[in-house]
Amino acid sequence: MYPSPVRHPGLNLNPQNYVPGPPQYSDFASYHHVPGINNDPHHGQPAAAWGSPYTPAKEDWHSYGTAAASAATNPGQFGFSPPDFNPMQPHAGSGLLPPAISSSVPQLSPNAQRRTPYEWMRRSIPSTSSSGKTRTKDKYRVVYTDHQRLELEKEFHYSRYITIRRKAELAAALGLTERQVKIWFQNRRAKERKVNKKKLQQQSQPTSTTTPTPPAVGTPGPMGTLCSGSAPSLVSSSPLTIKEEFMP
């Protein structure tokens, strides 16, 4: 093969397997070569000699058909010259980005990023302030009707621990879930234990207060006599010592 400044050194093409392709540019035949660039004798040939199927110029254009097709999409940005042509040029510049990538860049504006959380906060503030209950209480707290409480109380007096079968039947009859029936029975048993504990405390308090209290000091006893406990306090057997003090 003939050396050429356009050919990549790693490419090896055989002229026997070469099939010439259509020219990429309409004015390609009128291009004028500059003689004396290097020692290649084919650079000095006229433009008409390029029409032969095994000339180096057409082989170069066929081997770099992909790069020429990408350069043809933007013909105003490039000026073709064989010594300056580089097959790696489309990957170096930032202006040859795909249209999808370059078009998506202006959509990410800082105003759109700041606007989204602000609108989300504005929508969430009225929802939290309007309702006094939290999500957990709204989800799990159930307000039973009078009919439901009556039927549940009847079942509780019959059996403090409801069976699985009866729980399913009662939930279907009252329009509740089995979990709601189970929670009601758990709360009802806890309430019963609390009431029984309070009753036991009330029963133990009167027994401790029935012990007799001793009579007060100085109270008259039966037959108009004084209590024995009041005698020592009235008559004192110890002599009184009087200390006289004189002023000088």
UniProtKB/Swiss-Prot annotation:
Q: Segment Disordered: which positions?
A: 192-248
Looking up InterPro entries in the UniProt record yields: Caudal_activation_dom, Caudal_homeobox, HD, HD_metazoa, Homeobox_CS, Homeodomain-like_sf, HTH_motif
Q: Which residues bind DNA?
A: 137-196
Principal localisation: nucleus
Instruction: Spell out the subcellular localization from the entry.
Output: Nucleus
Please provide the record's keywords in A-Z order.
Answer: Developmental protein, DNA-binding, Homeobox, Nucleus
GO CC term (a single one): nucleus
For biological process, the GO terms are: anterior/posterior axis specification; cell differentiation; digestive tract development; embryonic pattern specification; regulation of transcription by RNA polymerase II
Keyword DNA-binding listed? The answer is: yes
- Has UniProt tagged this entry with the keyword Phosphoprotein? no
Q: Could you state a single Gene Ontology molecular function term?
A: RNA polymerase II transcription regulatory region sequence-specific DNA binding
Q: Bias regions of kind Low complexity — which residues? A: 201-211, 228-240
Q: What top-level branch of life does the organism fall under?
A: Eukaryota
**Family membership noted in the UniProt record:** Belongs to the Caudal homeobox family.
Cite the PANTHER family for this sequence: HOMEOBOX PROTEIN CDX, HOMEOBOX PROTEIN CDX-1
Q: What the protein does?
A: May play an important role during the early steps of organogenesis.
Q: What is this protein called?
A: Homeobox protein CHOX-CAD
Print the organism lineage.
Eukaryota, Metazoa, Chordata, Craniata, Vertebrata
